[in-house]
Amino acid sequence: MAGAIIENMSTKKLCMVGVALLLLQVLAFLVGGLIAPKPTSYVNPVAMKCVDVRKNHRSSKWLMPWGTEPCKSIQSFDEAANRMIEANDIVFAAHIPNSQFEMSPWFQFMLVVLQLDIAFKLNNYIEENSMVTLDVSVAYRDDLKEEWKELASSVEQRKLNCILPVEKTLANEGRHYDCDVIPLMELGSVSHKYYLFNIRLPVNERKKANIGIGEIRDLHVVSIFQNGGFTMVWFAMKTFLTPSIIIIMIWYWRRITMMTRSPVLLEKVIFALGFSMTFINIPVEWFSIGYDWTWMLLFGDIRQGIFYAMLLSFWIIFCGEHMMDQTERNRISVYWKQVGPIAFGSCCLFIFDMCERGVQLKNPFYSIWTTDVGAEIAMAFIIVAGICACLYFLFLCFMVYQVFRNISGKQSNLPAMTKARRLHYEGLIFRFKFLMIITLACAALTIVFFITTQITEGNWKLGDLSIELNSAFFTGVYGMWNLYVFALMFLYAPSHKHYGDGQSNDGAGMSSGEELQLTTTITHIDGPTEVYRLAGKEAQE
């Protein structure tokens, strides 16, 4: 009989494969931990307070904080008051990056947040639920001698969340508030070398614009971007892993098509998982180095979503097809109760992502976190997603427990077998349990990775919650996905070896009782694998 490679491989060879995969997994972690720098970096320039007394503030003149033609600036708002300069004539100008540096397409994205330094004054304090109005213009250029070109401009409102750590008394005047960072904009590509931000805080008492926001002392324009060195390591991993998965996927499907039977459900799902892994591996990001593809962040989220959906569905089907409860499954329709919610959840994630990053393709200043309702919905989504992920993990653990329990029940039939048959099935069950444990470990690590990335993307805090994810964790989990898919397609591919009764001539052969108990009657040489026969889930031919 022709079974899967995992059923015919000796324990010694299986251990060798396991050690090789483990070494590659350790290598994936070391690549991130020792070679790659931290995934993200940031620059935090303090915006220069430029004076622009022109009547038409909307004209095309850009105010530079430094350079050959720096703007006329002031040191503080006290100086502005002494010189009778109105607040509407003050422009916060910030150049990214700092002088003598350049931005690069290797940075992949740029997230910009604002940090306000606000001093407490008894006659000018921050009111409750105050909003700050920002008149923002962003320009770019690729040469220091070029004229600035407008990238985007908008008038945005952001909620001001500040806490004064001391009592509001006269003695504490001048103490600074502790304020949350204000999300400003996000760019899906960094295709230019220099960026200039001109930000006004227009005051309009009639419209209540920028009234009750305290005494602003300074404004920090914090720019967060992916490290170029990490991008190179990440691209190199993708470039190396893509052909590896494609080759094993072609080899796997070729072995299946050479058989006289049609593929069973588990084999189809494993191939689909390999295809989704290939889709996420293909390093199309190389093109973003030469082209201004602002949609790459959204495209990356879609690829990850497809892989997550396929991976979660595979684990459910993998456990169900090995339940050993004599229930005929082998059809995707049997799992609609489990796979349906995964598909629904994936669609919800896609809609949420389109509402955030989809809109940012047209308006980079848009953020769902800028309003109370949007922030509450987004936070609720993250909490619900985390809860659903944990519930899914618990349900998966329960299914694994059922599989192990049913296997233990089947093991009671082993003493009645011949020695050769008993050793064969004991090895088969051991290898299956080993693969189930590895699956459970991968599921746990994937859930942790999902929750961690969701929390970090949702907040981008500079304080309590670090904006940086561990490089070793990124590369290690990514390598784990690829090694897991590679191992599945290799171990569950049909074997060229044949296992029959002639292989155990020293025993009396398998009795009819054994065949009835374990449902392993051989119909033809290319029949379902022994795991499928043991589970009682043969393909309908």
Swiss-Prot record:
Keyword Transmembrane helix part of the UniProt annotation: yes
Main localization of the protein described in the UniProt heading: Golgi
Superkingdom of the organism of origin: Eukaryota
Residue intervals annotated with topology Lumenal: 29-232, 290-303, 353-379, 453-471
Keywords: Cytoplasmic vesicle, Developmental protein, Golgi apparatus, Membrane, Signal, Transmembrane, Transmembrane helix, Wnt signaling pathway
Entries under Pfam families matching the protein: WLS-like_TM, WLS_GOLD
Topological region Cytoplasmic: 254-268, 325-331, 401-431, 493-541
GO cellular component terms listed in the entry, alphabetical order: cytoplasmic vesicle membrane; endomembrane system; Golgi membrane; organelle membrane
Positions of transmembrane segments: 233-253, 269-289, 304-324, 332-352, 380-400, 432-452, 472-492
GO molecular function, one term: Wnt-protein binding
Example of a GO biological process term: Wnt protein secretion
Compartment(s): Golgi apparatus membrane; Cytoplasmic vesicle membrane
Function: Required for a subset of Wnt-dependent developmental processes, in particular, eye and pronephros development. Regulates the secretion of wnt4, which is required for eye development.
Protein name (database record): Protein wntless homolog A
Organism: Xenopus laevis (African clawed frog)
Gene designation: wls-a
